Amino acid sequence: MKSISNILNHILQIENGFKHINDGASEIMEIYSKEQCFELALELFKHEAYQARMLATSILGRLAATNNDALCFLKEQVSTDKNWRVQEMLAKAFDEVCEHRGV
């Protein structure tokens, strides 16, 4: 089992692509409770590295299928991020929300 810092260090080394971000989100979601994942995502979103914010967005997208606070954070905070990669991850997050909520 990788620690959060190991997952984050791996993610920060890769500049392109989404697979490693989604893999990191999956690892975190398997290790921690949904409540812990939500708090972690909020902290990760404050990080200056766009990769960390992408990871936060991926986690929040998975949580937002059933968590209205995560959905609101995506709509109100993530949507204002200026990095296009974070916006791409936001689009994927909303795809997941729509798939699970039936919208």
Question: Over which residues does each language-model region extend?
Answer:
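Hydrophobic face of amphipathic alpha-helices that form TPR/SEL1-like repeat modules
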Residues: 59, 91-93
